[in-house]
């Protein structure tokens, strides 16, 4: 049986997925991207192959995506993050939808029709507001491990509104709030609300709302806040961090099965 590989080299994390001929995920891997994307992609591939008990020559086709997609020498082709995240999300929820992906360095809002075709998209790449980098800055300013933020936000009992989306200005405001005696959990929840507000200002929502990305995977309370703002349930794939890599693997499979050349 042939297998297909998708690798998503993000600014912070590299994700890799292997699927079989029936589009079932058989293995995955995730690592910090580091500075040598090629080496990181190679390590992810080796890890996933070992987990699936596969040999390298059993991978019939592969596609790379993400910030470092041009730095994966063994990939047969490259696809945009928009295409791969959209394809991965639509595999899980086959309906018209708006996909919000919150990454380390950018946020994306994608609109798909009920056939999975992309109708429009918007990206936030010029500012850290509404991204994982903003949340990392909050953790740094509060001197907290990044992994503690979600639990803190869940324990908040008071609404605190940060007045700025800008990471630099927000950091200054956080220091002022700490001096004023605001609780860390209330500040973190306020920061999460700031991310949510920024995302909804990027574009409108059409159809079902789906959220993907590592920020969502590690901070599920963000989804709760989005649901409060959206007024309806938010759909989250089983493994939101790997949706881009999964979509790349699915596209590699489809192109190979249709006899198309890698792009």
Which positions does each model-derived feature cover?
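Glycine-rich phosphate-binding loops at beta-strand->alpha-helix junctions
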Residues: 67, 200-201, 206-229, 240-244
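A short acidic Gly-Thr/Ser loop motif
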Residues: 8-12, 67, 102-106, 214-218
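Active-site nucleophile and cofactor-binding loops and adjacent substrate-binding regions
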Residues: 32-33, 77-86, 100-104, 122-130, ...
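Adenine-nucleotide phosphate-binding core of ATP-dependent small-molecule kinases
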Residues: 167-204, 241
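Glycine-rich phosphate-binding loop plus the immediately following alpha-helix
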Residues: 115-158, 163, 250
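N-terminal glycine/serine-rich phosphate-binding loop of ATP-dependent small-molecule kinases
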Residues: 1-81, 225-228, 233-234, 260-263
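Conserved phosphate-binding catalytic cores of ATP/NTP-utilizing and phosphoryl-transfer enzymes
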Residues: 67-120, 200, 247-257
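Glycine-rich phosphate-binding/hydrolytic loop that grips phosphoryl groups
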Residues: 135, 237-263
